[in-house]
């Protein structure tokens, strides 16, 4: 069932789906290059509920305590090579997003003047990864931005390298969830500031990666 929300976006509200063994192996992260999507969804929305209703849901069981893949692994072992391929979204080389579903700025910390992540970036990258895994059927556009410090052309190149670094990190972490064609990158350099560049705070806001998800 698909309904339109207050923003005019179409939202899937349910329906049923039958998964075969290969599909379950994929969503429980048992296939090479995949991650446990069930665990990510459970934890993400568990944290949301706990934050919204702290008195009703002060805590919830850890995912590892409620998700047991022993039976699934046993069935897969018995099936051997007689397992079909999982049903996964396909993305064409033309990765242009024609319908934007979500747009968000992420402050991913890089080494100054480089496209290398700082240790502080890890938590943000993990959160971004989880969000994109949950929305696994959507295309992703990674937009790199800088402040106005330094040479204009060098900033354009730097924003491209940083956007590519995010793309490469996601694809290496889970090739199955980020196949070729899902992620596209665009470099903007200092051309699209969201805050004045006259202050350190403004510059910090402009050094960002914008993630767009859509169809």
Predicted segment positions?
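Periplasmic peptidoglycan-binding/tethering modules of Gram-negative envelope proteins
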Residues: 57-139, 176
């Amino acid at each position: 069932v698909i309904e339109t929300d207050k923003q005019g976006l179409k939202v899937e509200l349910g329906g049923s789906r039958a998964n075969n063994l290969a599909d379950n192996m994929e969503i429980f992260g048992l296939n090479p290059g995949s991650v446990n999507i069930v665990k990510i969804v459970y934890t993400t929305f568990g944290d949301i509920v706990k934050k919204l209703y702290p008195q009703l849901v002060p805590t919830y069981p850890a995912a590892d305590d409620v998700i047991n893949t022993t039976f699934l692994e046993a069935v897969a072992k018995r099936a051997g090579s007689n397992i079909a391929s999982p049903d996964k979204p396909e993305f064409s080389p033309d990765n242009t997003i024609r319908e934007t579903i979500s747009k968000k700025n992420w402050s991913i910390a890089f080494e100054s003047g480089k496209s290398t992540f700082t240790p502080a970036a890890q938590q943000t990258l993990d959160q971004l990864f989880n969000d994109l895994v949950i929305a696994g059927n959507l295309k992703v556009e990674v937009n790199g931005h800088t402040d106005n410090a330094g040479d204009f052309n060098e900033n354009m190149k730097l924003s491209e390298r940083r956007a590519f670094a995010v793309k490469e990190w996601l694809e290496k972490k889970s090739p199955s969830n980020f196949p070729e064609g899902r992620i596209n990158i665009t470099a903007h350099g200092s051309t699209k500031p969201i805050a004045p560049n006259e202050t350190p705070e403004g510059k910090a806001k402009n050094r960002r990666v914008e993630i767009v998800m859509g169809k």
